[in-house]
Amino acid sequence: DRQGLTDVRIEPVPGQLTDHYDPRGKVLRVSSTVAGKPELGSSDPTNQMLGVPASTGLSVAAAAVIAHEVGHALQDRERDPWMSVRQAIVPAVQIGSGIGPWLIIGGLIFNMLGLAWIGLIAFGAAVIFTFVTLPVEIGASGKALAFVGSLGIQGEQQTGARDVLKAAAWTYVAAALTALLTFLYYLMLIAGRRD
């Protein structure tokens, strides 16, 4: 609410590290680890407030996660172009990341290089997705850094939340580099079969 996101609902979601913002439904889903705090929306009958009073005992990491997801909601409200691109390519990525490696392996095992190349192209969609995700995730963390203090986190805890947000952004950089290296590995395997 403090960020002007009155149209965003908050819902608990089972599991751990399952926190995410759904731009299609304008829903901020908070994992059961974090949602166990009744102050995170369940006490609000409209499920529209995200207020984290200092008395909640909310961990620094949980506050950072919430702030990051609110950052995504802010990106959605501002119609961030990278977020729109990411949403548009999700279907291709789901298919490509699921079948791409299998097509590559099958193509190599059965010496069907055309199939392996198709698999590499399909897997390439997942690699592109990781790089499109970078500005989205880094942007959400940047927005979260700007208002993490408004969540009732001050002093050393605020510094800790900032460190968590920066570390989270770096995990996406690592994921993108890992995807690129995996793509290059598959490329070398396929190209090496031509000899």
Language-model-detected regions and their locations in the chain:
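Membrane-helix exit/interface motif
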Residues: 74-82, 103-114
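Hydrophobic alpha-helical transmembrane segments
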Residues: 112-122
